[in-house]
């Protein structure tokens, strides 16, 4: 393994460590005596603290929060994925589990990341706790990815099955994710600010670990502490647009009708005092992970540049962009060819990257050529997509690494660049790996071992490919991390040939 390969792995590890549940809670929540400091505000603790949480990472968050607040915590309930306590235990992550004398009740549900009756019971317990609070109380809400499925609370008289049927039909009809979330929030007691409304007049502090590009508070776990700006009329318009209004169950119509008349709790119209009593703080995100990675890169003697935390779109386009950026950085001569810059800027919108971010990044790469800074560490993150055409085993990170490796192998002279793509949760698709590391030698290495890259890609079989290639040495295997802020991309670019010409 090359020196750049080793450093790329170290940079990725630093990104993940920086958004571990205990780490983000320690950074976001400080206690000095009976004062709790969070998000620039201070709250007085008088044995008046309650805690609720929902999401795949909240168990570790809750364990650290309880360590910080101590005996001021009266009671708590967290809704977590089915089997997660045993999974964490088997992966040696006991630190993410609650102590045996914890005041927090752990409830498991949402098998296969789908709302179910177990998760609904958890949501009811969370709602009951929030509804019991007074103006003297403080409710700490812990939220992470997967929280929406772990907090199903259909507005009565609607059943969970009826609510799921509506959203399933909308999805099948081609509704956008924004439209789905608008309807989902409208039909829920707790989403779209409903939990904050239940807890009123208590003060509410939400600590959020974001797994959504751009960290939109209303979309993370469907925004239980964020007032929904959608009107009942908007919800009806969406249902009308997809010709579902007439076929709605009577219970769903009743919920929406009550919302229009102001009697229900579907679409939330929170009074000002509820909004004033809520503090939402994003304590972990892809941006924070990239900042931690950047610091590690500097320690390792690399020059870091953060491209964007919002990379999305098809992995083929994303791979092409990284290939172009490598060519731009490593092309011989005093200046990169201007047509490369034009192609990079043209591709940016397809993969969710602003032109300003691309121009800023290219300026840094040009500066490296002129000043001879040494190796550059290009950092990005997000959630690209893969169009499935085969039935192999793989994930978007392994497929992206594979495709970037093929991009880097093009041309007469290999740049020496190294690319890593990894999921911060430690699991890329239905595989044991988080991702993989690739470079310009990938295609030649595969061919020498009788592996046809094109056939593996056609079958979406990137995990099998990397497992067979050089005995799996290119795979990224951090194990279960207990966190999730989407993916991290690391591309290490060696000094340009121009440095050697000076």
From Swiss-Prot:
Pfam families: DUF4147, MOFRL. Signal peptide: none annotated. It comes from Danio rerio (Zebrafish). One of its GO terms (biological process) is protein phosphorylation. It catalyses: (R)-glycerate + ATP = (2R)-3-phosphoglycerate + ADP + H(+). It is found in: Cytoplasm. This is Glycerate kinase. Its EC number is 2.7.1.31. It comes from the Eukaryota. Disulfide bonds: none annotated. Transmembrane segments: none annotated. InterPro entries: GK-like_C_sf, GK_N_sf, MOFRL, MOFRL_assoc_dom, MOFRL_protein.
